[in-house]
Structures are given as structure tokens and as C-alpha cells.
């Protein structure tokens, strides 16, 4: 395991773009879309840098971690907010930032007629940042924060043209149905904490052999429900068709 200080920039860049565009208001209308696209592309560049560094190390040393801060410290339960980049997550980092940047570029022209384009690009940046946290978090709690962030960003993007009742209804439907999957993930985290005393990926992996089959089965079922909700699998797939009500770039992103 290798330590790094640059992983946080993968998330911080698009997150800063979302914050600046939302807080900057109309002052960012003329150039906000360009800034959002540049920050998404910059995050992709950081991902390429991390990939190049990873390829230069042995297989055992390729995973990279970064501790951000102590998040929860209650009795014997301690959770550090941290990031973990390995061979699997780097593939998703490059997919999220690479395809996300292309969608940003396409949206510059597609949304050029919209007077509220700045807000749209802020939500795009927010989606990218949340998705990156989802794949980079080193614990189930970090994953959960990113998971909920993706749900919020999806709701905001699907219902972007909320002056049309059908679009507003579609975003609400997606948001509510995804809550079923969210409950599955939250119950899986509770099972992990109750039976293993940890919610970090490394800690859970270490405790698997000492955990009952019933607890592992329950946790697995809850994670399956979570995945079904988020990826629109049966029987939680009904929201996906309505999600196409959002602007075309949103459909591509989701």
C-alpha cells in the first residue's frame, strides 16, 4: 500500500466547480460552463497521472491511500475519512472523468440556449464529484456519502427543467425509488458494524472469516438490493425510463 497526497484533487476539483457556480450566481453565467468543463478535464488529468504512477510500481504496491481526517471517534468505534485507489477504482475514475468531460463538452453547445446553463453545469460537476467519492471512499460510510450525493445530483439533473410538471414528477420518482436501494445499503452498513465492529473495506475483509454465515448472507442481500436500486435492475427499474425526461446529456451521464 502506497500513500498519496493527490487523490483528494480528483474529487476536490469538480466539487469546487459546483460550489463556485452555485455560489457565484449570475456573475459566472458567461464562463461558468467553461470552468466546469476545465475542472472535469483536470480531474481526468489527475487520474491519468495516478495511473502512470501506479503502472510504475509492483502489483502489491499499486493500491494508493490517503487519510483526510478523523471523521468519527465514539468509544471504540473510529472511522477516518480516507480515499483508496487501486487497479479497479482507477478504471472507474478514468471512465467517470473521461466520459464526464466529453458530456460537459457536448453540453456547452446543447445547453447554449438555456438561460440557466450555469446551474446545469454546477449539477454536472456535483454528479462527477459524488461518483468519484463513491468509487474512491475507503469505507462503507464514505461510499454511502458518495452514493447519496449521486442520488441528489441525479434528482437535480433529471428535474432540471422543473417548470414542466412531467419532468418534475420524473425526478421525484427516481429519487423515491432509489431510496429503496439506499435503505439496503444503510442496513448492510449496520450489519457490518453490529457483527464486525468496523465499516472500513479492509476491516470488513479481515473479519469475514470470523462472521456468521447468516450475517454475511444478510449483508450480501442488502448490498444486492442497493445495487438493484441504483442500477435500475428488476424490480426497481421503473424509474429509469422516466429519467430520460431530463436534458439529453443527463441521459448519457446516468
Segments from the language model and where they lie:
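...captures the hydrophobic TM-helix bundle architecture rather than a specific catalytic motif
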Residues: 1-254
Amino acid at each position: 500500500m502506497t500513500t498519496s497526497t493527490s487523490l483528494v484533487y480528483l474529487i476536490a476539483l469538480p466539487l469546487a466547480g459546483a460550489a463556485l457556480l452555485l455560489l457565484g450566481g449570475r456573475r459566472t453565467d458567461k464562463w461558468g460552463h467553461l470552468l466546469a468543463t476545465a475542472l472535469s478535464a483536470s480531474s481526468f488529468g489527475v487520474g491519468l497521472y495516478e495511473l502512470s504512477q501506479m503502472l510504475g510500481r509492483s502489483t502489491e504496491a499499486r493500491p494508493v491511500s490517503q487519510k483526510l481526517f478523523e471523521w468519527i471517534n465514539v468509544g471504540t468505534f473510529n472511522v477516518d475519512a480516507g480515499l483508496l485507489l487501486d487497479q479497479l477504482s482507477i478504471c472507474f475514475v478514468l471512465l467517470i472523468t473521461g466520459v464526464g468531460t466529453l458530456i460537459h463538452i457536448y453540453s456547452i453547445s446543447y445547453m447554449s440556449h438555456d438561460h440557466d446553463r450555469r446551474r446545469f453545469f454546477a449539477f454536472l460537476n456535483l454528479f462527477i464529484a459524488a461518483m468519484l467519492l463513491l468509487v474512491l471512499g475507503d469505507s462503507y460510510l464514505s461510499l454511502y456519502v458518495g452514493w447519496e450525493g449521486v442520488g441528489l445530483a441525479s434528482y437535480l439533473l433529471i428535474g432540471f427543467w422543473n417548470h414542466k410538471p412531467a419532468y418534475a414528477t420524473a425526478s421525484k420518482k427516481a429519487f423515491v425509488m432509489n431510496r429503496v436501494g439506499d435503505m439496503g445499503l444503510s442496513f448492510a452498513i449496520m450489519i457490518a458494524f453490529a457483527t464486525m465492529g468496523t465499516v472500513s473495506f479492509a476491516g470488513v475483509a479481515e473479519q469475514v472469516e470470523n462472521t456468521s454465515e447468516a450475517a454475511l448472507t444478510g449483508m450480501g442481500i442488502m448490498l444486492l438490493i442497493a445495487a438493484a436500486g441504483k442500477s435500475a435492475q428488476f424490480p426497481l427499474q421503473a424509474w429509469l425510463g422516466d429519467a430520460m425526461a431530463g436534458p439529453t446529456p443527463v441521459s448519457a451521464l446516468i
